[in-house]
Amino acid sequence: MENFDKTMKFDYEELPTQDVRDVLNNVYRTLDERGYNAVNQIVGYLLSGDPAYIPRQNEARNQIRHIDRDVIMEELVSYYLKEQNK
């Protein structure tokens, strides 16, 4: 039986931070150009994994699907915390 009192380490194969940022910026711009609330759409995608939240325009859907959602969330949380602790 496993001990659930121990902290598990989450590890993943890192993508270059700039690649994740470039994709998120492209997705954001594309959603904004289409008149969507970009933050709501990205959150919807991250929570559900449903690519229908992201348009195909500018290859936004293809790009974001090539990055694991955990990697995107890690980048967003990391960036937010670094900005808050400057």
Curated annotation (Swiss-Prot):
Belongs to the UPF0297 family. HAMAP family: UPF0297. It comes from the Bacteria. This is UPF0297 protein SAOUHSC_01721. Pfam families: IreB (PF06135). InterPro entries: IreB.
